[in-house]
């Protein structure tokens, strides 16, 4: 059983307007569900997911039609990526720049950037992109997920952003010469999506 926050919803046009596709994310793991819902919950509502059954405020809402989890992906730290992070077309690999710190200290607490940027930003961004949302909106949703995760560590968002920004400026100054090699084969450009817009908060 888990708790998921609604981040978006649309009418299911294939069901004559009588059901809705609801997207919700559990920021802790993180994991994502798409729900075939009989009513329209507000964005920000908390859903309870038990198996494939979904409820809102103790009342049945619908069924899970799709589920994705951080457990389904791997994070690669092997490549020189100018814009720090990105993801493969199939969503099975998250990429973080090899020169970006994997941990840093914010307000006396260690923060894993593999978790905060890789799994709590890049991954939700990919989930939203796969649902047809354009980059700026997917990025906005992902930044909100990242913020919830960071604050759950007892770190302020401003303190975290200041530390990320300091390190991003250093990474931005590097030239992306090549993507390197993985498993003995070079990665073709059409198999890699880099986050080409600046990382903004």
How would you describe each model-predicted region?
Residues 28-41:
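Beta-strand/loop nucleic-acid-binding surfaces
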Residues 2-14:
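Structural detector for short beta-strands of small beta-barrel domains
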Residues 14-23:
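Short aromatic-glycine-enriched beta-strand elements
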Residues 117-129:
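Active-site recognition of the HExxH zinc-binding catalytic motif
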Residues 53-54, 94:
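Hydrophobic residues embedded in beta-strands of well-ordered beta-sheets
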Residues 62-109, 113, 130-201:
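Metalloprotease/metallohydrolase-associated module, dominated by Zn2+-dependent proteases
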Residues 44-53:
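Flexible glycine-rich surface loops and low-complexity tracts that mediate binding to linear polymers
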């Amino acid at each position: 059983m888990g708790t998921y926050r609604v981040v978006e919803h649309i009418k299911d046009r294939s069901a004559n307007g009588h059901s809705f596709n609801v997207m919700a994310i559990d920021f802790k793991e993180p994991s994502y569900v798409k729900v075939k819902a009989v009513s329209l919950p507000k964005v920000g509502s908390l859903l309870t997911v038990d198996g494939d059954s979904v409820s809102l405020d103790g009342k049945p809402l619908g069924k899970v039609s799709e589920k994705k989890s951080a457990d389904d992906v791997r994070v690669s730290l092997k490549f020189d990526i100018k814009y720090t992070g990105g993801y493969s077309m199939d969503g099975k690999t998250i990429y973080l720049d090899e020169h970006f710190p994997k941990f840093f200290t914010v307000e006396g607490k260690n923060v894993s950037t593999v978790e905060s940027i890789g799994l709590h930003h890049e991954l939700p961004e990919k989930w939203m992109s796969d649902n047809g949302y354009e980059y700026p909106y997917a990025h906005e949703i992902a930044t909100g997920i990242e913020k919830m995760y960071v604050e759950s560590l007892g770190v302020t968002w401003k303190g975290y952003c200041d530390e990320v920004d300091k390190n991003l400026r250093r990474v931005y100054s590097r030239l992306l010469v090549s993507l390197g090699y993985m498993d003995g084969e070079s990665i073709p450009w059409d198999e890699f999506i880099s986050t080409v817009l600046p990382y903004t908060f």
